[in-house]
A protein has these predicted regions:
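Cysteine-cluster motifs in flexible loop/terminal segments that predominantly coordinate metals
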Residues: 84-146
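C-terminal hydrophobic helical "lid"/dimerization subdomain
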Residues: 1-3, 253, 300-350
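Glycine-rich beta-strand-centered segment in the early N-terminal region that forms part
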Residues: 22-36, 46-94, 99, 152-154
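Conserved beta-strand positions in the Rossmann-like core of class I SAM-dependent methyltransferases
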Residues: 65, 209, 266
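Glycine-rich phosphate-binding loop and adjacent beta-alpha segment
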Residues: 249-314, 348-350
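Mid-domain Rossmann-like dinucleotide-binding core that forms the NAD(H)/NADP(H) cofactor-binding site
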Residues: 139, 146-148, 152-232
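A short acidic, Gly/Pro-enriched loop at the edge of an enzyme's catalytic core
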Residues: 234-242
Length: 350
């Protein structure tokens, strides 16, 4: 199937190119992409791949166009959010924790199917694709049917980021930290993940503090009831829970210092591989540190729940999103880095 796709190659400008999708296998579908979020993981992967040509994108939303022969539960014409890939059969998948799938790295980050076959070609040559089981910086994506969550009649640009970034922020609060009404949560970083985490916690009656240096990213959480600070060095009360979206060692150290005894720190940010910790403080204050992938979420369960919260006015996801044409990936990334947008979303038709 011929599609238009955004091809990335190291530091070179992205380009919109003609590409060829492989035919769907029995457990795959082709989704006509209507919107796709830009996530920090796309940028990290682009840097990691160096000069290797790649079609990235892993927060796709669109309409199912073709079904593999064994696909059930989906129909042509269904609007779906395409989330991360998982095998469905390992211990973690069966336990409802597909983010920790035994095959997660191969399925989401190898650039090919599990058997090593490519899913997308440019100028006749295979390129890095099947990113998070989709590679949705394109007008259509070949996706694992298991990754597709039907969402009904909702705005694609609003729900597309639920495939990863928004899912991670909300899931970290609801599934991992689980603060109770009246607890105090510190969210470090007010990007897409942090903002949704803050909004989710506020909807649960939790007191929220957001630490974010960019003024524009502090505005919405503050209007929704959060206390906002520009820096962790500003005076603030102790907290029961912390969500760090930055991965910075200095932020993690400050988070641990601010936690009340028996408090919990959840980590969702990609940072340096090593961080120094005061083991004595962890032990004597009963502190817990918890890693978190994809919000410990089962997308098929949490995505519909978050959409219902949005529709009830509890999660103003639309106010986080700025849209761009598909070809303007680099401008969207530049705007995000400059603090001009919280969550850029690309529109293949716009």
């Amino acid at each position: 199937m011929r599609v238009s796709a955004v091809l990335s190659r190291g530091a070179a400008p992205s380009e919109l190119v003609d590409a060829e999708l492989d035919d769907p296998r029995s457990d795959e579908v082709i989704v006509r992409i209507e919107a796709v979020g830009v996530c920090h993981t796309d940028l990290v992967t682009r840097q990691r791949l160096g000069e290797r040509p790649a079609v990235l994108g892993h927060e796709g939303c669109g309409t199912v166009e073709h079904l593999g022969s064994a696909v059930t539960g989906l129909a042509v014409g269904d609007r779906v959010v395409v989330s991360f890939a998982s095998c469905g059969g390992c211990d973690q998948c069966r336990a409802g924790l597909p983010g920790y799938c035994a095959w997660a790295t191969a399925l989401n980050g190898s650039g090919r199917r599990l058997d090593g076959s490519p899913t997308i070609r440019v100028r006749g040559e295979p390129v890095f694709g099947s990113f998070f089981g989709q590679s949705s910086f394109a007008t259509a994506a070949l996706a694992d049917a298991r990754s597709c969550v039907p969402v009904g009649d909702v705005s694609p640009e609003v729900v597309a980021p639920l495939g990863c970034g928004f899912l991670t922020g909300a899931g970290a609060v609801l599934n991992v930290l689980r603060p109770r009404h009246g607890d105090r949560l510190l969210v470090i970083g007010g990007g897409g993940v942090g903002s949704v985490a803050a909004l989710t916690a506020l909807s649960e009656g939790v007191e929220v503090v957001v630490a974010e240096p960019v003024l524009a990213r502090r505005t919405l959480p503050e209007r929704c009831g959060a206390t906002v600070v520009a820096s962790l060095d500003e005076p603030m009360p102790s907290v029961t829970h912390v969500l760090d979206t930055t991965g910075r060692p200095e932020s993690i150290a400050r988070a641990l210092a601010l936690l009340q005894p028996c408090g919990v720190l959840a980590l969702v940010g990609l940072g340096p591989a090593e961080v120094s910790l005061d083991v004595w403080a962890l032990m004597t204050r009963g502190l817990r540190i918890r890693g978190c992938v994809e919000g410990d979420a089962d997308p098929a369960l949490l995505i519909p729940d978050l959409i219902r919260r949005y529709q009830r006015g509890l999660l103003p996801l639309d106010r986080l999103v700025t849209t761009y044409p598909l070809a303007d990936l680099d401008r969207a990334v530049a705007d995000q880095r400059a603090g001009l947008t919280t969550k850029p979303v690309l529109l293949p038709g716009g």
